[in-house]
Amino acid sequence: DIQMTQSPDYLSASVGETVTITCRASENIYSYLAWYQQKQGKSPQLLVYDAKTLVEGVPSRFSGSGSGTQFSLKINSLQPEDFGSYYCQHHYGIPFTFGSGTKLEIKR
């Protein structure tokens, strides 16, 4: 199975800041990479697929990049609704494994 290594595990940032989350695949997955946001008690919501394609309705402050084994999700000008957990997932071959997640919290 393809292993997905996500970092950091935890991120504390302020509204208005820019953050970047990274994901590394254990082998080449080309651009078959998705990013999800999950709020506590809710199902994950797809943000990005094919490494860089934003789902309709997702704000343009989100951007995905990368290919092969190295990927990133950048969030510009963080908004209060952006805080939660983020996961990468490859969709190259079954099983579609997830990264371990990044918890993004408001810096106090």
Swiss-Prot record:
Residues 50-56 are annotated as: Complementarity-determining-2. Residues 35-49 are annotated as: Framework-2. It comes from the Eukaryota. Disulfide bonds join C23-C88. GO terms for cellular component: immunoglobulin complex. Transmembrane segments: none annotated. Keywords: Adaptive immunity, Disulfide bond, Immunity, Immunoglobulin. One of its GO terms (biological process) is immune response. Residues 57-88 are annotated as: Framework-3. Pfam families: V-set. Residues 24-34 are annotated as: Complementarity-determining-1. Residues 1-23 are annotated as: Framework-1. InterPro entries: Ig-like_dom, Ig-like_dom_sf, Ig-like_fold, Ig_sub, Ig_V-set, IgV_Light_Chain. Residues 98-108 are annotated as: Framework-4. Signal peptide: none annotated. Residues 89-97 are annotated as: Complementarity-determining-3. This chain was isolated from a myeloma protein. This is Ig kappa chain V-V region MOPC 149. It comes from Mus musculus.
